[in-house]
């Protein structure tokens, strides 16, 4: 068996050497910036993105930049030793590739311990559907190679493209994990949202630290290629402790039940691998319990945990809302256009079936799914059945969206408590997982919803629905203005998500006006970026002008994040102008008393609006016209503020003041 594993390792190493020898197939001389000078992180990312786009590796720089900035917001990409590895995984990437910039002057980049100086930037462009391909193997090899101090130093000191490419082609490689007899064993899992850079570099640093400390360290990488280096049963059984270095859910986490675990961000091992291993060795293992002792760093605040749970539940419920709303809307349109009202109401007719299918997704499934996956976010798989039960109870007592949220939180926290306090011998693991957890959780969460908190929540939900239905005049204007402010305040951030959740909650209760407001406002920021850069290009930097060329298309699709690059560059003036115009748009749509029951339809919402007696054409004109009016106001304000800033030297552009 030992000989088999040695032979397997030798074959693996040979494959890795062949892969590393071809790293240059994923880059090009024109994708290398040597001794570059950038004034900001955004400028560096934009410059490298433009180089990849010029090589035909990226179809849409805007979509790619949006994804890169989204990844930047999730966690640090500066990895120490002067290295930053920003990356984006999106359909805008035609072919996996990377670009490199060595900097003449270090940039401040967000790292594990706060901002740090960076003089080497490697930008990875990752397509979403290339897992397991040679391209992805090359990218994973690259990120592993960046953990090699000698190779990284050669790249940083390269003065010509040939020297840099030669450093990438170096045959140096990583060493296999050494096996130390009578030494403790640490099992690890690394995983990051993109599944490339941090996943493999964190694994490499943990293995290096293990060799240095004389500890058996085995790392399972859950990356873009799926699970690599899967931990064996022997490794898990002999493990003293486990380190989870991840920012996404661990796959098959039940394998680690009973092993004391240390959970940290995926970038943590890159800077503090030895300290993490030493800390993990202090954790105590109990073979008689299945409860994992976790030392979570950093500990999530209740506010953060609640937000993540709600957004997780919503992310699973939205496809049901979109599908159900669209099917129901199509059935209604067919009945109206072709005069099929009788067929629409005739039980068991084909049109009635579609009506019931769409209505069932919205009225029956949506609430239990929302509750179940809100609970799942808090307590993993054991909370699913109790979450579904709590959602079903919410349906039974008519507490709607609000009941789903409350029920999901009850089920999630209840099952977390049960997991932490109900401890049985490991012989009863199956009984605990497949019987006690779902039965106790269902009885507990279901009973609390039906007989304790459900009725008060239903009263609040029904009161809120009645208030929303009764809004008119100044109240509707105020609601529209508030939603407009929230939608454009942070362009897809927490405030925007809070408005989105409110609108979905209202929609689930049969109130469609708030989402009509939200959908119209989403176009304002995108239209403003395009209009302002077209009308006065000299007031904007080159990357802002490039962004503006296609942002309007993202606006038609209902995507606000396309305006983020401009907002990051000049937040006060840009966000301020977006918000003012969006408040006007929201107020106009709110006053029109129109509704929208299909989220995510973008410009096609024009055909799905609930006109409430105003007429379909007038509702569509008013809804889209409100977005144009808001964009015009935002554009005028932004140009005025930007012109003043440029004139007084408070903002520097690539052009000359007109």
Swiss-Prot record:
Enzyme type, top EC level: transferase
Q: What induces it?
A: Induced by mannosyl-D-glycerate. Repressed by MngR.
Instruction: Give the chief site where it resides.
Output: membrane
Gene Ontology molecular function: any one: protein-phosphocysteine-sugar phosphotransferase activity
Give the Phosphohistidine positions (modified residues): 87
Residues in PTS EIIB type-2 domain copies = 186-282
Q: Where in the cell is it found?
A: Cell inner membrane
User: Among the record's GO biological process terms, what is one?
Assistant: phosphoenolpyruvate-dependent mannosylglycerate phosphotransferase system
Which sites are catalytic?
87, 192
- Per the record, ranges on the Periplasmic side are 1-313, 380-389, 455-474, 522-551, 595-620
Query: Which EC numbers does the record give?
Result: 2.7.1.195
List residues in topological domain: Cytoplasmic: 335-358, 411-433, 496-500, 573, 642-658
Q: Can you cite an annotated GO cellular component?
A: plasma membrane
Q: What is a single Pfam family found in this protein's UniProt entry?
A: PTS_IIB
Q: Where are the transmembrane segments?
A: 314-334, 359-379, 390-410, 434-454, 475-495, 501-521, 552-572, 574-594, 621-641
What reaction(s) does this enzyme catalyze?
(2R)-2-O-(alpha-D-mannosyl)-glycerate(out) + N(pros)-phospho-L-histidyl-[protein] = (2R)-2-O-(6-phospho-alpha-D-mannosyl)-glycerate(in) + L-histidyl-[protein]
The PTS EIIC type-2 domain covers which part of the protein?
Answer: 306-641
Boundaries of every PTS EIIA type-2 domain copy: 25-171
Residues bearing Phosphocysteine? 192
In the UniProt entry, what is the domain comment?
A: The PTS EIIA type-2 domain is phosphorylated by phospho-HPr on a histidyl residue. Then, it transfers the phosphoryl group to the PTS EIIB type-2 domain.
Full protein name? PTS system 2-O-alpha-mannosyl-D-glycerate-specific EIIABC component
Q: Which organism is it from?
A: Escherichia coli (strain K12)
